[in-house]
């Protein structure tokens, strides 16, 4: 189910966010947390994404597991600022292959010492365009209504 359809519902929406572990050794703690959260019957669960795609495979695996085992729709986060184009395409294709149709597209924090002028993606809007070209995704984004803090 697409998140936009859930949010359009007149009833209040309940969602939870989980963070993938940094290593596969900590998967059990995430699995146990997901079990407890899923029992609360949330409308959806979001799964965050490590900076630079460091836990991107974990994001896709956890999101797919939540949907497959618990029937809870998921929203996979993606960041782009320090991710090469090929990584973004691979992650997007993996999400699609695993049946994840909801993505929260974020620029992400600029890593210390990173030269933004060398980035394949400088803005989340560029990531959104890339995701749209790769499948029928429901894409959300974040914004700063008054201006991004970097420009204030």
Name the predicted role of every residue range.
Residues 9-13, 41-44, 70-74, 99-101, ...:
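Short, well-ordered coil/turn segments that N-cap beta-strands
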Residues 13-29, 74-86, 138-152:
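Active-site mouth loops of central-metabolism enzymes
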Residues 26-34, 59-60, 91-92, 149-152:
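Distinct, well-ordered alpha-helical segments
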Residues 53-77, 120-141:
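Alpha-helix-loop-beta-strand connector modules within alpha/beta enzyme cores
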Residues 80-94, 121-122:
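Glycine-rich anion/phosphate-binding loops
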Residues 102-152:
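Conserved anion-binding
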């Amino acid at each position: 189910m697409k998140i936009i359809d859930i949010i359009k519902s007149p009833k209040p929406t309940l969602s939870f966010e989980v963070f993938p572990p940094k290593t596969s050794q900590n998967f059990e703690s995430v699995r146990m947390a997901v079990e407890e959260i899923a029992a609360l019957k949330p409308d959806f669960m979001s799964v965050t994404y490590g900076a630079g795609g460091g836990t991107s495979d974990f994001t896709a695996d956890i999101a797919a597991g939540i949907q497959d085992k618990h029937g809870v729709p998921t929203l996979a986060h993606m960041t782009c600022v320090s991710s090469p184009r090929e990584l973004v395409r691979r992650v997007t294709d993996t999400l699609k292959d695993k049946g994840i149709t909801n993505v929260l597209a974020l620029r992400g924090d600029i890593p210390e010492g990173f030269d933004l002028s060398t980035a394949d993606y400088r803005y989340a809007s560029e990531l959104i365009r890339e995701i749209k070209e790769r499948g029928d995704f429901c894409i959300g984004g974040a914004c700063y209504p008054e201006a991004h803090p970097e420009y204030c």
